[in-house]
């Protein structure tokens, strides 16, 4: 089998506390927004966003690696959920 050329993929990773976990940062932001007059804000949940560039042969391989990174390091599966989007960079 011939070697495939590596492509660059951009993984956009979103990590957020699970809905059942208290979010003190989100509560603080919510209070700040309300005190600034943004009375229509009902709630805020804070999270993390990361962009990771990967050299992989296929989108499936990039997806597997991103999942592995999230599960092993980036997200704490006990209290956080994650999702990601992949795009091939030209």
Where are these regions (language model features)?
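Long, contiguous binding/interaction regions
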Residues: 1-90
